[in-house]
Amino acid sequence: MKVIKRNGKAEEYNCKKIKKAINFACDGLSVNPLKLEAKFDESLFDGVTTKAIQDNLILHAKNLSTPTDDEWLLVSGRLATMDGWGIVGCYDKPFINYFEEQRNNGEWSHKNFDIYTKEEVEIIGTFIVKERDLQHTIASVETAESKYLAKNECIQMLFIGNAMLYASVEKTPQSRLLRVKEFYEELSNLEWSLASPQLMNLRKGLNNASCFILAPYDDLNSIYDAFKDAAQISKNGGGLGWYLGFIRAKGSSLMGTDGGSGGVLPQVKVLNDTLVYINQAGKRKGAGTVALPIWHNDIMDFFDIQTEVGDPRSKSFDIQPQVCFMDLFMQKLEDNPQQEWITVCPHEVKEKLGIVLPNMYNEDFVEAYSEIEKAVEDGVLKVFTKYKVIDLWRKYLQVFFEKGRPYAGFMCKVNRDNPNKHDGFIYCLNLCVESFSNTKPDVYHHTCSLASLVVGRIAVNELSNKASSLTRLLNNGMMITKAPVVESENHLRDYRTIGVGIQGLADILAREWKSYEDLDFITEVCERIQYGCVRESIQMAKEYSPYPKFKGSRWDVGDIFDEYHKNSVCPDLDWLEQKQLCKQYGIYNSQLTSPAPNTSTSLFMMASAGFMPHYAEYFYEDNKDGKTPVSSMYGKDNPIFYANSVGYFKQHELTKAVGAGQKFVDTGISAEYVLDRNIHEVTAKDVSMLVKEAWKNGTKAVYYLRTIKVGEQLVKTDELCSSCSG
C-alpha cells in the first residue's frame, strides 16, 4: 500500500512508523496504545496522504477520550504537536538561527529583540525545553494554533519570545538573562497565563493592553475623537468600555432648540457599527460595552436596545449594555421599592444647577439628588421622568433575565474603594467588568494589561512570590509597548494600571479539597496574591519611581493598608510593614489586581476559567474543527468537586464568594452567573435576589447571566472575554 508524503512523493506504507508515533504519544500515560492502533487501521487505504494519516490519528485519539479516560486528550495533543514540529521545524536548528529567521521574516519584529547579543541569544536557547510542548492537550494545541502562534512558531518559541521581550528592560545583561529564564519557566510550566493580546501581538511590537474605557464629553469633537480612538483600539485588539453619562438625554435642548437632542441611542448605534467594521486585528470580532447610569433620562430606551420592542433602527445587537447603579437607588429598592426615582438629563442638570452628575457618588450623589428633587418640584428642570423604583427594577430584571444583560456596576462601591479617588472618578466598567480606573474625557482612557496566575498549579504558600514575579512581568511589558492612542499613553504614564488575575479558582479549591463555601480560603488566595503584587510594586517604585499620581492616593494616605490589615486572614503577611515601605518609597502601580474571565486562555492553559465555578467536569468546546473534549485539572483526584458544576449552585450564594475575594482585589472580579432550569426552578425573585445580594455582599459588578432552559445544556463560549483579557 502506498502513502503520499507532504512533498507529493509516494512510498510504501510502514506500520512501524505509525506504531512508533503512537507509542511516543502514549508514553508515561495510563492508556492502551493498541486501542488507537485498532481504530486507526480502519481508516487506511491505498494512496492515503501522510497528512490524512496524522489527522486521523489525532481525531481517533480525541474520540477515545471519556470523562474517566481523559488522558487520550493528551495523546491527541501530543500527536498534533508532533505534526506541528514536522511542519514548522523550529527545533531542528540552533535557536540563534531560528531567532534570526523570525526577525528577518517580520514575525518577531519588536525592536527590543535587538537588545540581545548573539551570545545572549545562544545562552537563551539553552533555556528552551522542547518536551514541554508535549504537556498540552488537544484543546490547548488547537487554541494555540488558531489564536496565538505566529508563523513558524511552536508553543515553547512563543513563550521564550515573550520572555525575552518582558526581560529586555532589565538594566544589565546578567539580570536580563536571569529574568528571561525566570519568565520562561513560569510560562512554560503553565503557572502564568498571559492575556490574548500579549500572546498574539507582543512579538510583533503591537498593543498588548487588554482593557480600555472611554468617556466622551457632551461635545461633538469629544464624541467623534472618541469614535476614532475606539476604532484604533479595536484595530489593535483591545476590548472597549464606553460611558454615556455625560451625553444629554433625548428631548433635551440642542443649539438653542428645545427637544432637539436625539439622546444616547444614536451614539450607541454608531459605536456598535464601528466595532463591527473595525475588528480586532482581523482575528476576532470587535467588542465593547456601553454604560448608562440609572439616573439618566434615556434609561428606559436603553434597556430596550437589544429587545424586539421599539424602532429597529435604534437597536444595537453587537455591543454589550451595562447599567451603573447608585447605592441610593439600591437602598431605596431595599427599604421601600414604591419610592420615587427621578431620571434627568446631565446636560440640563449641569447648565441649571451647576452639578456634574457623573462625578457624584456616595454622599455627594445623595446631596446632588436632593437638589435635583427640589429643582424638579420648583419647575427648574424640564427634562425628567418620575418612576417608581420597583418599575425601573422590574424592567431591568426583565431584560437581564431574557438577554443576560445589561451588566450591573455598583459605582458607589467602585468609587469608594478607588485607590485614586483623590484625582478623579471611575465612571463605568470595562468589557469584562474586572478592570477599571480613573477616566477623564479627552485626557485619560482607562488602559490596563492583564495576566493571570494559574492557581491550580501553584502551592498556596507560593502565591505571593508568583504574584510578585508576574507583577514585574506586566510592568516590564508596559515599558516596551506603545498604547494605540494618546489618551491611553497618558493613562499608562500617570497611573500604570495592571491587572494580575486568577485563572482556575475552581482548580485550587478542588486540589485543596475546599469549596465555594470556604470563604476564608478564597479570601486567603486573593490576599496572598495582592500581597505579592503590592510588595513587588513597592520594590519597583524604589528602583524607578512611584506612579505620578501617587501623592494623595489611598496608597499614600495608607488607609488601604489599614483596610487590608483589618480584613487579613493570613497571620504571616505583614500589611503594616508594607504600609511603612510604601510611605518610604511609594508604589509603582495605581492598581494591581483584576481577576478576568480568561475563557479562551484557560483552554490553552488547561485550567478552569476565571474566578467562578467550572462549566462541567467534562465538556465539549466548539471550534472550526468541530467539538473538542475538555477535561478538568483535578477531575480524577476530586471528581465530586467537579461534578458540582456552576449550574448546581444557588447563584446568589456565589456572590458571597466573590465578595470574599473582593476584599483583596483593588479593581473588580469578573463574575458571570448561571441559572439552570434543569436543576433549579427559576423565578424573577431568584434573578432579583442575585443582583441585590451581589450589591449587599460587597461585589462591584455582575457580569452576564446565562439561563439554561429545560432540556438544554450549558454551551461554553468565549466570544466576549476573549475580546480583551482572553
Sequence positions of predicted segments:
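Internal maturation/activation junctions in enzymes
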Residues: S469-E489, W513-N598, I669-S670
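Catalytic alpha/beta core of large soluble enzyme barrels
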Residues: E120-S140, A144, V433-K440, L474, ...
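Secondary-structure capping and boundary motifs in well-ordered enzyme cores
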Residues: A10, T49, C154, R179, ...
